[in-house]
Amino acid sequence: MSDTDADADTDAVSTTETSMNADANANADGDTLRTPIVAVLGHVDHGKTTLLDTVRGSAVSEDEAGAITQHIGATAVPLETVSEMAGELVDPADFDLPGLLFIDTPGHHSFTTLRSRGGALADIAVVVVDVNDGFQPQTIEALDILQRTGTPFVVAANKVDTTPGWTPTDGSPIQPTYESQPSAARDRLDERLYELIGDLSDEGFSGDLYWRVQNFTKNVGVVPLSAITSEGVPDLLAVLMGLSQRYMREQMAIDITGPGAGTILEVKDERGFGATVDVVLYDGSVRPDDIIVVGGTDGPIVTDVRALLQPRPNAEIRTENRFDRVEIAQAAAGVKIAAPDLDNAMAGAPLRVVRNRDRANVVSEVEAELADIAVETAEEGVVVKADTLGSLEAMANALKEADVPILRAEVGDVAPRDIAIASTANEERNQTVLGFSVDVLSNASDELEESNVRLFTDDVIYQLVDEYKSYVDEQERAQQETVLDKIVRPCRFRILEDHVFRQSSPAVVGVEVLSGTLKNNQYIIKWNGNEPARIGELSGIQEQGEDVSSARAGTRVSIAIDGPTVGRQIEEGDELWVELPEKHAKILEQELIDEIPADELEALTSYLDSHRKRDPFWGK
C-alpha cells in the first residue's frame, strides 16, 4: 500500500494530533507506573458487555477533567474517575497507579486472545457470573485458562437486582444496599452466592465474599453486583485498584519512552488504510514512522507505521469520520495501527517496535514467541482453525489432552484449502475440520457439501473437543456393529428331547439356545473330548413357524442342519456349537470383547478354553 493510498480517504480520519496512553504516573527517577490491564470474561449473556458499558457510561457521566479515554479495543479509566465512581471506597491519596485499562474485545469469545510473552496480557481479570445460572461452560473454560496463565482474578456475581424482592439503589456499594433489603431477599441472595462459592471450590479455587478475604493470593474474592443498576460496581473498582496497588505495583514500572511491545487483538480492513491491526500496548511506546515487527501466518512481518488511530469521542462506528490520528501511543493503551503488508498479521500474535534495536534481533524475538506457541502436528490428523493465535494454542492443548492428532493448524476462517487438506486423510475420523470462533467462507461451504469432510464449530473449546470425540465414538460403534454383523458370533445350543422332526437331508430338530447368538449359514461343531468335529452347516431357523435369521440365548427354535443324520453324528440332548474361525475368535477377544453381551462372552470364553486345552496359542 502506498503513502498516497494511506492518506486517500481524508474523511476517514481527523487530522487532530494528540498522544494517548491510559494515563501514567512518572517517578522522580523517570520510571513510569503504567495502568494495570483488566480483562473481563464470562459466559454468554452473563453480563460482561453490560458491565463494560456500565463502567464506560458511569465514567462518562461523572464528567471529570480526567474522564475516560476510549481506546481501540480498550477503555481507560483514570484514578480520579475510579474514585468518583467508587466514592469513599477509593481514596486517590492511597494509590500511585494511574487507573485501570479495561480490555474490550467484542466478538472474541476466549481469553486466549490475550497473551503476551507466553503468559497473559491482562494483569488481572474479572470473571462475570450470573448469580441465577452459576458456572457455565465458558466460565469454566475461562477459569482453566486463568489458572494456566497464573492470572489473578475476582468474580463479579452479577444480576443481584434480579433477586426476588430486591429494591435497587443505583450506584450504591453492595453492603449498604444489601443491608437495606428485606430479609427474604438477603437470604435468597446468600443462597445463590454460597452456591457460586461452591462452584469455585469444585473448580479448585478457594473463594469468599471479597470483604471476608484476608489473603487474595490464596483466595478468590467474590463481588456481588448489578451491571444494570451499578450496585456493587464501586466495590469491583475498589477491589481491582486495591489488588493492583498491593500486588502488582512493581510489575507496572516501565519505561514508556522505550520501544513498544504489544499483542494484536484483531486484524481489520479500514477504508483508506487497508489492513490495520488493533493492538494493546503493554510496554514502551509506538509512533508513526516506527519500524515494527508483527507475527504473521507465514512468519514475522517487518513494516513501518503509517498512522496511529484512536476512536473519535462519541463517534458512531458507522460514520466515516470516526478516527483521530495520534502522534504517540504509550503503554498501557489500545491503538489501531495502519501500516503496509498487514494482511497476513494474526490476532493474538506479538508486535514489537524496533527503533534503536537491531532489526534482526527483534525479528528473532518475534520468531521465538511464535515458535513458543507452535502447534505440534502429525502426518495424520485433523485440521484446526481458530480466531487467534492464543485460541489455536489452547485448542492444540485441549486436543493433545484428548489424544487427538493434528495435521494442520492455522489462524483464520475455514477456507476451501482446509477442506481439501482434510479430505486427504486416510482415516475417516481425521477427515475433519475443527473451527473455534471462526466463520466458514462461502466457497468453503460449497466444497464441504461435495466432500466427505465433517466440520465442527463452537465458541467453547472443550465443547468443540467433546463434540468431535462423540462423533469419533459413534463412528467406532458403527464400525464395530458392522464388524459384529459380518463376524461369526459364538453360540452354544442343545438339541431338545423328543424334538426330532427330520433325521437327515437336512436334519430338522428343535433346540434351545443356551448362550450367544445362533445365525443362519454357519458351520456347526460337536466336541469329542478336546477335539472339535464339524458336523454340518446351519441352513434355516424357524420360530413358531416363521423363518428368522437369528436366535438369541434363552429362545427355543427349530433348525435345519445340512450334513448330519440324527442317530449317527448327532443325538437328542447333544450340545452343539457354532464353529468360530480362529481369526474371528481373536477379533472378538481382543477388539470387541466389550461390545458383546455377557452370555455371548460366556460362550466365547468356553469355546476358547476348549481350543486352548489342545493349543494354548489358539486365537492369540
From Swiss-Prot:
Region (Disordered): 1-29, 162-185
Region annotated G4, chain positions: 158-161
Presence of keyword Cell membrane: no
Keywords: GTP-binding, Initiation factor, Nucleotide-binding, Protein biosynthesis
Alphabetical list of InterPro entries matching this protein: EFTU-type, P-loop_NTPase, Small_GTP-bd, T_Tr_GTP-bd_dom, TF_aIF-2_arc, TIF_IF2, TIF_IF2_dom3, TIF_IF2_dom3_sf
CDD domains the UniProt entry points to: aeIF5B_II, IF2_aeIF5B_IV, IF2_eIF5B
Polar residues compositional bias, start-end: 162-183
Region spans: G5: 226-228
Annotated region described as G1, given as residue ranges: 42-49
Ranges where the tr-type G domain occurs: 33-248
SUPFAM superfamilies cross-referenced by the UniProt entry: Initiation factor IF2/eIF5b, domain 3, P-loop containing nucleoside triphosphate hydrolases, Translation proteins
A Gene Ontology molecular function term of the record: GTP binding
NCBIfam families cross-referenced by the UniProt entry: aIF-2, PRK04004.1, small_GTP
UniProt record similarity statement: Belongs to the TRAFAC class translation factor GTPase superfamily. Classic translation factor GTPase family. IF-2 subfamily.
Protein name: Probable translation initiation factor IF-2
Organism the protein comes from: Haloquadratum walsbyi (strain DSM 16790 / HBSQ001)
